[in-house]
Amino acid sequence: MLLMLVFMAPVSCAASDKFYADNVPPTGNPIEENTEYFEKFVDLGSATLEEKVDMAARLIPTPAQLEWQRWELTAFIHFTVNTWTGQEWGDGTENPDVFNPGELDTDQWVRTLKDAGFKLVMLTAKHHDGFCLWPTKTTSHSVASSSWKDGKGDVVQMLRESCDKYGMKLGLYVSPWDRNASCYGTPEYDDMFVAQITELLTWYGDVAEMWFDGANGSSIPGTPTHTFDWPRYMKAVKDLQPHVVTAIMGDDIRWVGNEAGRGREQEWSSVALQPAPLKNPATVVSGLEAKSADLGSRDVLSRAKALYWYPAEVDVSIRNGWFYHADQQPKSLETLKQIYFASVGSNAVLLLNIPPDTRGLLPDADVQRLGEFGTWIRESFTDNRVIGGDGAWQAASGKSREFDVQPGQLFNVVMLQEDIARGQRVERFRVEITSDGSTWETIAQGITIGHKRLVKLDTPRTARNLRVTIEQTRRTANLSNVGLYYAK
């Protein structure tokens, strides 16, 4: 299909200081001529709706955001004094000696996750209780005050070494809410928290993702609260390691809005939701929040004053709780399959929590379930029934492309992918099959695609040909992959 050439009338707007113009895209492939691409942010100014739609199509991720999206599977490790006290939120009064993982083996954590296909492991270096899993200089509420390894242990360092050993990326969760710090609620606490960020980003090598929770104590009556200095925290992170993506209360990755393991029917990465650290009243859309069902449709764009490349992360635990509890069991394989379709298959990255037990090991049942999950993914998404489906192609609104399908091969999953290095553009799609070359049957339709869209069919099918129609798109749609798979 011929590439459409689109020539834009100038639109008054302010964008990020990094953009791509004159046919030089982030992928190095030919794209629309004379096109300006906005990286991560664009101010819509006084643009009309059609101009906003066009600008949304030219909003693209940073290289770090793009890499993050391609990981697809990431793992959370909730591990601290709560593992022994049985609490989900510790209160900061714990005796450090309660932390005593006699068989701690971070190699087991990382090896298990690597074998299951995960690309990053995220450790709760500090949860709300304030207990630090590294020998911080900022507080005595840490592993250095425990009897574990005679106070010389360092969980973060152990995990760093395991990640290096197995080729896994390291992420760190650091709670700004600290129920142990006596200075919490005062300006001195901001200094303390920045010092903790600095230690983590200077002592432990490259960190790929930093996860900042938004809880501050306001939900518990009588608990001190704090107004977090998010711009200062984010500056500290980016000054120390510019490539780090910051999640949830950061400005690179947003919380999907639930802990049920599912994305939206229309999951946009270019959204009008302002990232938490920015705090710019001029670009806030009234009523729009992380839990809103729609963050980027044309209806939202009509009210938007700015747009952000702010992709979704789906965080969910393999058990009912985030921390280990002996009376809980891992979710079934069928449930994990559903979560995969609703997260990775809905233009999001899955952050699956697997909590170590009091030994310091991932529980045997969880290890078995992760192995089953990884095997299912590999077996399901290895053999694409579409012939030539992995080639890049473009389509304007209403245009289609047909593909041959491996004869006689069953499939029950449709996969579509956009080249999001050039933005997210598809607003409505339809997928049809034919067995005789003339009678077409619709088997899937939807709104957004993004990095990856998976549609599970009710019944396995065979076909001679497949047709993908981009019914509506913002500028020219850039498809990178079309697939039909059989998932048991």
Task: Name each region found by the language model.
Residues 16-433, 442-458, 469-480, 485-486:
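Mature catalytic domains of secreted/periplasmic carbohydrate-active enzymes
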Residues 1-10:
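Bacterial N-terminal signal peptides
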